[in-house]
Amino acid sequence: MLRRTSFNFTGRAMISRGSPEWSHRLDLKKGKKTTMMHKLGTSKPNNALQYAQMTLHDLTEWCLAYSPWPLTFGLACCAVEMMHAYASRYDLDRFGIVPRPTPRQAEIIIVSGTVTNKMAPILRNIYVQMVNPKWVISMGSCANGGGYYHFSYAVLRGCERAIPVDFWIPGCPPSAESLVFCLHTLQKKIRWHEIQKYSVRD
């Protein structure tokens, strides 16, 4: 079960996947990782098989962290800022974050805009088709809680009612810089956690 990433005013974040034996503290300003609780057992490999498994595990984490493929799910005006993040000023492609046209190739879905009641089953089906491990970014006030259309009968008040959300980006609309920061934070989160800790949340 995923817990929300909580930010405080010092620029630190606690990230945990709900596992009691493993927890990290990230210092987002300095880019350091401090292990608060060590995993049970030894940290060094005892034989060649464990060394090969650890090396393969590190390679898999590196590939996931530095080549995440998002699926852009633009529903309203927040999608303009999402497109701006891929334009020449920020150019997310140079970080390996290349948008994919199909959910079967994507690991991240960026929901940007108002999710209506008719769109919720489609969003859920797209989420189910994505490969594991998968992450969800809710971008903008409308995707976070309904926003300007919160009291409308036809609007889903937050996309987390349809799919589990990992990151929330506030704003109406949020800037492209906030999306870039969120994707870099997600890259750090992928890099500093174990692959087997990610649960299949279908």
Curated annotation (Swiss-Prot):
Q: Quote the cofactor binding remark.
A: Binds 1 [4Fe-4S] cluster.
Q: From the UniProt record, list the reaction(s) this protein catalyses.
A: a ubiquinone + NADH + 5 H(+)(in) = a ubiquinol + NAD(+) + 4 H(+)(out)
Q: Which InterPro entries match?
A: NADH_UbQ_OxRdtase-like_20kDa (IPR006137), NADH_UQ_OxRdtase_20Kd_su (IPR006138)
Superkingdom assignment: Eukaryota
Q: Where in the cell is it found?
A: Mitochondrion
Keyword Endoplasmic reticulum belongs to the record:
no
Keywords for the protein's UniProt record, in alphabetical order: 4Fe-4S, Electron transport, Iron, Iron-sulfur, Metal-binding, Mitochondrion, NAD, Oxidoreductase, Respiratory chain, Transit peptide, Translocase, Transport, Ubiquinone
Grouped into one coarse class, the protein's main location is mitochondrion
An example of a GO molecular function for this protein is: quinone binding
User: Which cofactors does it use?
Assistant: [4Fe-4S] cluster
Binding of [4Fe-4S] cluster occurs at C77, C78, C142, C172
A Pfam family that this protein carries is: Oxidored_q6
Q: Name one GO cellular component term.
A: mitochondrion
Transit peptide extent on chain: 1-56
- The record's EC number reads 7.1.1.2
**What's an example Gene Ontology biological process for this entry?**
electron transport coupled proton transport
The protein's matches in SUPFAM superfamilies, at most eight in alphabetical order, are given as: HydA/Nqo6-like
What family does the entry list?
Answer: Belongs to the complex I 20 kDa subunit family.
User: In UniProt terms, what function does this protein have?
Assistant: Core subunit of the mitochondrial membrane respiratory chain NADH dehydrogenase (Complex I) that is believed to belong to the minimal assembly required for catalysis. Complex I functions in the transfer of electrons from NADH to the respiratory chain. The immediate electron acceptor for the enzyme is believed to be ubiquinone.
Q: How does it assemble?
A: Complex I is composed of 45 different subunits This is a component of the iron-sulfur (IP) fragment of the enzyme.
Would you tell me the protein name for this molecule?
Answer: NADH dehydrogenase [ubiquinone] iron-sulfur protein 7, mitochondrial
What gene is it encoded by? NDHK
